[in-house]
Design a protein with these regions (language model features):
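N-terminal secretory signal peptides that target proteins for export/translocation
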Residues: 1-13
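Bacterial N-terminal signal peptides
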Residues: 15-29
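His/Glu-rich zincin catalytic helix
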Residues: 33-130, 152-155, 165-167, 236-341, ...
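Peptidyl-prolyl cis-trans isomerase
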Residues: 173-176, 181, 229-232
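A short, acidic, amphipathic alpha-helical segment used as a generic capping/interface helix at domain edges
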Residues: 234, 449-455
């Protein structure tokens, strides 16, 4: 405790005798639905030295004050008074792209982005100027594949009531002006055309379609046709039917008083009425049972952009901690096997990685990177070699220990960000995790054994059923890819090219 009230000091055991308090400071919000599940790199990780001793790191995250408003809105409040700053995250279940009509890809994200473009009493310019004058930040989005729309805001606690009032206004009373909608759609059209020349986008698009098939998560962007179908009336209807308080979670962290704030929220959000939302969840994605190879042709490209992977687990799968450790060993950081092999030893690439998505439905594990065209053959060989190696050989004790300690150290560093701690609290609600999940997280990671790593590698990284996706010069790399299976070739617009020689 300190003179300003409750402290978020978290005591971390970093050695046998050394105890350090990590004080949480303000940072931009990181949203649970948008975060990558691979372990963040740190300076310590790049040096392959994790600053956590063999003692298991023990943390006890602050528990939020929780309330349910009369309209059904769940509110989570984390008080932190030393810094005069407040972070707000609002997750609106059922308003995400996962539920949008098949012919209107981008409806959810466009609706969310348009919240800032005008309310019943403010123009887009007035909203922007008022937020800037208050020194605040306000944004909204709905990621492809996500079941939620997310509104984020932050600013000083001294003028919290003012900037939160603007956020409430755009949430409850958007006008979706036609002229602003047309401007946004035109910007999206330009962006789509530009993305057709970006190998990273082409890879993501084809990889998602390869692993997700007919699942809505296969979409990574709107199409020109779907943008044409999105109208002001469609936005109004989506907002009216999907933005419901009983399916939403409002998280607030910072220099606020929970008791006083809950009473304010009850009044300020009283106009947000319940709406019956029908959430028809698509069937859970399943892993492919046979290997397929896909190639997006970029004539004269000097590099191959490569990914290989398959559907793995959802967030509640008990294999999650083992997957975190396995992924870290094979490709989760600069000390990983793929990085040391393909970059440090072979010099094939400046960066190579692996990660996995585990949300409320099963997502893919994937590995990949950008490679010089002439080393495509060697790189593919090494990708499969490393996958077979982690399946056939148990990870040595020292390597396993270093990986687990690095994961725990990165987790500890993330607790310095109040927005991140708020995201952890929201994640417990979103995924139905135990209340003490994050307190026990370091111990769960440290409990992962070499047998566990080998088991999940064998279970989810079957080389014979991985989906292989490459973007590059088909004339040069198609013969190489054919060694791994029949190659389906597409142009940059996604049109099949048939039996291109």
């Amino acid at each position: 405790m300190n003179g300003h009230g409750k402290s978020w000091d978290i005591w971390l055991t970093l050695g046998r005798c050394l105890v350090v308090a990590v004080t949480i400071v303000a940072a931009p919000p990181l949203l649970p639905g948008q975060e990558s599940l691979s372990t963040p790199q740190s300076k310590v990780e790049r040096k392959n030295k994790a600053p956590v001793s063999r003692e298991i790191l023990r943390v006890k995250l602050p528990k939020p004050v929780e309330a349910k408003l009369k309209n059904g809105l769940t509110v989570l409040i984390l008080e932190d008074h030393p810094a005069p700053f407040v972070n707000v995250q609002l997750h609106i279940g059922g308003a995400g792209a996962l539920f949008e009509p098949a012919n209107m890809a981008g409806l959810a994200s466009t609706t969310a982005h348009m919240l800032r473009e005008g309310s019943q009493t403010r123009t887009s310019i007035q909203i922007a100027e008022e937020i800037d004058r208050l020194g605040a930040a306000l944004s909204a989005g709905a990621s492809f594949g996500s079941p939620d729309a997310v509104l984020s805001a932050s600013g000083l606690s001294d003028n919290f009531d003012q900037w939160f009032s603007v956020a409430t206004d755009v949430l409850l009373h958007p006008s979706f002006p036609v002229e602003e909608l047309e401007k946004m759609k035109q910007r999206q059209r330009v962006q789509l055309r530009e993305q057709r020349s970006a190998p990273g986008f082409l890879l993501d698009e084809r990889f998602h379609r390869a692993v997700y098939g007919e699942h809505p998560a296969a979409n990574v962007a709107p199409t020109l046709a779907s943008l044409d179908a999105i109208s002001q009336a469609a936005l109004i209807q989506w907002h009216r039917e999907r933005y419901a308080p009983q399916d939403a979670i409002l998280g607030i962290a910072g220099d606020v008083r929970a008791k006083n704030l809950i009473a304010k929220l009850e009044k300020q959000l009283a106009g947000w009425k319940k709406t019956e939302v029908t959430e028809t969840w698509p069937r859970n994605p399943t892993a492919a049972t046979e290997r397929k190879v896909f190639l997006v042709d970029r004539p004269n490209s000097v590099q191959t952009t490569l990914a290989l992977g398959n559907i793995a687990i959802d967030r509640l799968n008990p294999d999650y901690p083992s997957m975190v450790v396995m992924n870290h060993v094979i490709g989760g950081g600069a000390s990983s096997r793929l990085f040391l092999n393909l970059r440090e030893e072979k010099g094939y690439t400046y960066g190579v990685y692996s990660d996995f998505s585990a949300l409320r439905y099963a997502g893919p594990w994937r590995a990949g990177g950008n490679l010089r065209t002439e080393v495509t053959q060697g790189a593919l060989t090494e990708f499969f070699n490393e996958i077979r190696r982690i399946q056939d050989e148990k990870v040595p004790a020292a390597e396993l220990e270093a990986s687990k300690r690095s994961i725990v150290a990165s987790f500890a560093l993330s607790l310095e960000q109040p927005a991140r701690v708020l995201s952890f609290a929201i994640a417990i609600k979103l995924y139905g995790l135990p209340a003490d999940y994050w307190d026990a997280y370091p111990a769960k990671i440290m409990a992962v054994s070499a047998d566990d790593v080998q088991r999940v590698a064998r279970k989810y990284l079957n080389p014979d059923s991985l989906q292989v996706v490459a973007v590059g010069d088909a004339d040069k790399i198609k013969p190489i890819l054919e060694q791994y299976g029949k190659v389906e070739v597409f142009d940059a617009n996604g049109v099949p090219l048939g039996a291109k020689p």
